[in-house]
Amino acid sequence: TLFLANGQVAQAADVLYKRPIVLMRGSFNPVCNLHLEVMAQVKKTFLSHINETQADRCMEICEISMNNLLRGDDVDHLEFLDRADSLKALGKNVLITKMARFDNLSGLLARYTREPIAIALSIGLLNELFKEKWTEDIPGGILESFGRTFQNKTRLYVSPWLNRKSGEFVTARTFRAPEQYVHLYQHFLANGLVVDVPFFNEFLLRHTPRDIQRMIAADEDIWKTLVPEEAHRS
């Protein structure tokens, strides 16, 4: 289901046809300033890789999967709609899917467009893609999964992560893939399949959505500096 920023419900096939796409996957629970700043930087980087005509037709989407890849649990449908309302209040288009795996999402988008696609993701999700438990039902394993993900000019745009314990700042270029996939990952970087997104806002990176959830529950006002005002009201 695709909810447009203007409140309309649309068919993805109609809206995305022949359009370049910038898509951010996330739970958006809650929607926070980090999501917005990273999305803006991903889009800026993506637009520098396509021509002006393509840039004019670029479609920005926030996607929420009803099967969360990192948590593996289902959540209440009304909660999904609340998150969608928060994103729409910020002028974002929202796609709700049931796809945990990136290769399935890439395949879905490939039905609608042959233009370049940027999928924005965090270091945490990038690390998750190398776990074999997600490809047990794919004959070709991780290699086939990545092959499907990168079909039709789809690229992964990876935002950095700040390790709050060690202070290490991890980017797509410094990310350490599992030992058996180090050379494969270097191939992805060298060929532009994985794109390093330049971003650093230490204040935002130090507070995860789960931190913000705890702040809201504890009635700590600092959460209001981490969540856009439009989402306060939604």
Positions of PLM-derived features:
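Nucleotidyltransferase catalytic core that binds NTPs
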Residues: 1-234
